[in-house]
Amino acid sequence: MNIGIVMKKYRKIFIMLFTLLAISLTAAASWMEKPAVRDIGDKIQFYAFDVGQGDSFLFILPNNETILIDAGPEEAGRKLVRELKRLDVKKIDLLVATHPHSDHIGGMSRVLSNFPVGKVWDSGFIHGSPYQKNFYSAIQKKNIPFGRPKRGHSENMGKVLIEVLAPARLIRGTKRDANNNCLVLNITYGSTSFLMLADMEREERSTIGPLPGAAVLKASHHGSSNGTDMSLLKEVRPSLIILSYGRNNSYGYPHLEVVGAVSAIGAIRLDTKDGTFRIVSDGEKLMWPKEREAGKNGG
């Protein structure tokens, strides 16, 4: 018997078996990394995406319908689409453009080209930017139902209530009119509310009146002091506050006044600059990644 030939034969078999094992382990790891999005029971899931300096948030409702609020800047579009597909999102039932700034709608074209969309809500503020024109063109081309809801409008998606708090009317003559005409939403499941302030500033806030209490607050305008302050935080009394901003951004977000106010009221702060995270609620209790609380791990 030629020992060399036998050893060569077994070496080939070993390489084949090792390759198959590696493929199997890779597939298993890929499967395990993917959250069991559709199998968590009667709960609402909220994802705050890390899109750099911008906003993008996903709700997966107990009935498996989805709400995507904003899509971040254009350069984050591919990453956002990958994240949505990783979460096994097949359709966006409600796509919300809170206002036409590029850090909120820059990624919309990629979303619209990768997912069917049930309907679109828009703030109604005409900015005239190429991003907004492309967004409107894609909606029209796909013949997607389109609305510009105002304060007082509400809809139910299964057991979830979506309330429009603003805009109440068109606001002109401010430093940032687009921000002061944002779609501001309160999304409620059971006794848990998510107050989504977009980039609302003081002028728009004055049209709303007292803000509702909410367990989760998406702080206005990336943690800018012209959107979130102590009086607002005392009105809302959130347990969790989300600050959506990019690492080392040129605007200095979040402003120190906001960071101090959040700390003073004792709320837990979660920042998107540290990466995408998920909050889950059964309508009463909130679950969030404790390790992501600001102040931990150098955050």
What kind of feature is each model-predicted range?
Residues 2-299:
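Non-globular, low-confidence helical/coil segments that flank catalytic cores
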